Design a protein with these regions (language model features):
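Extracytoplasmic/periplasmic/luminal assembly and interaction segments
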Residues: 37-87
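Bacterial extracytoplasmic/cell-wall-associated proteins, especially those involved in peptidoglycan
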Residues: 35, 49, 99, 112-120, ...
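N-terminal post-signal-peptidase region of extra-cytosolic proteins
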Residues: 23-26, 56-60, 68-70, 93-95, ...
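Surface-exposed aromatic
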Residues: 23-24, 64-73, 93, 149-152, ...
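Conserved "repeat-terminator" motif of extracellular CCP/Sushi domains
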Residues: 74-92, 159, 167-176
Length: 319
């Protein structure tokens, strides 16, 4: 046994090969309940250390297995197992500034959180499937993520040791706070549920490149809903794709899904992204026009038409 410990002591003391990305900043989060072995595994996977075994034995031989703190730490690739361990035991945790742009969906938010080293994307997306902290987040069949649309786009100061649930809760509470009494009352006047408001606003968010377009697009969608016309919103089809396309094919618009607003009349089952205040307000206060169609050029400029013939001419013009 003594010989075995000597071998591992020599192994730990031996110099580590430095990864090719040595010195790249890494935010690493130790979550409650993580074991030293799981911490070492993640550190190794992210290039912070070159050996999870050395990390484990360093903790074991120094009696530090249960001394690692929870929280987020500023680390870097190419650290020795000893330096990494000392950082997690004696170092200070950090607060990360995290930005969600308008129009981000659950998947994009999850991927950005994982990139920052805060939570695993899969854990976040799994929790988002059933996350309904407020009664206005309705439960519908075929909805991908219950939380979709209700994680308000904003800048967040994420304190250390936040998990997927606490991050999601903070974002949903922010949405609930931003949804003022006046906005709720206005939605009621329009005979829109909060869920319908957010769903429609998410389409506006994904379609509008410029603020001045939001009320016009909102008005077109509301009018189409009243007339029983399909919304034919490209972003609802993009939402179904693993990777967005610059240009949808006709075959894409034929995919069988309740989210496909080319094939189905009415709103999709739920929101497709997180709308900002401007898109929510556009739905609540739409423009007054006779437009029924619109198309955007490569620069995001929208062109509007009142009839299908004019719309087709605009499509030929901009594409």
């Amino acid at each position: 046994v003594a010989l075995l410990f000597l071998v591992f002591a020599l192994l730990i003391a031996s110099p580590s090969a430095s990864p090719t990305n040595e010195g790249t900043p890494v935010y690493f989060t130790v979550r409650p309940g993580m074991s030293v072995s799981s911490i070492g595994k993640e550190l190794h996977e992210r290039g912070v250390i070159d050996s999870e075994m050395k990390f484990w034995w360093t903790a074991k031989l120094n009696g530090l297995e249960n001394k690692v703190k929870t929280g987020t730490f500023a680390m870097q690739t190419g650290m020795t197992p000893r330096d990494a361990l000392e950082k997690l035991v004696y170092g200070n945790t950090v607060t990360i500034r995290f930005v969600i742009p308008e129009g981000f969906g659950v998947k994009e938010i999850a991927e950005r959180l994982e990139k920052e080293g805060l939570v695993r994307a899969d854990d976040f997306m799994e929790r988002a499937k059933t996350f309904r902290p407020y009664p206005y987040i309705e439960q519908h069949e075929n909805v991908r993520y219950a939380a979709e649309g209700f994680l308000f786009p904003d800048t967040y100061e994420l304190s250390d040791s936040f998990d997927a649930d606490s991050i999601m809760t903070m974002m949903a509470e922010n949405f609930d706070h931003r949804l003022t009494k006046e906005m709720r009352d206005r939605a009621k006047e329009m005979h829109l549920s909060i869920y319908e408001l957010v769903t429609l606003a998410s389409l506006v968010e994904k379609e509008a490149y410029h603020d001045e377009d939001r009320p016009i697009i909102a008005q077109i969608f509301l009018k189409r809903l009243r007339l029983g016309m399909p919304l034919q919103a490209d972003p609802t089809v993009q939402y179904l794709l693993d990777e967005p396309k610059e240009d949808l094919l006709y075959s894409d618009t034929e995919v069988a899904s309740p989210y496909n607003t080319y094939q189905n009349v009415g709103l999709p089952p739920g929101p497709i992204a997180s709308p900002g205040t401007a898109s929510l307000m556009a739905v609540l206060h739409p423009a007054h026009t006779n437009y029924l169609y619109f198309v955007a050029d490569r620069n995001g400029k929208n062109y509007y038409a009142t009839n299908y013939a004019d719309h087709l001419a605009l499509v030929d013009q901009v594409r």
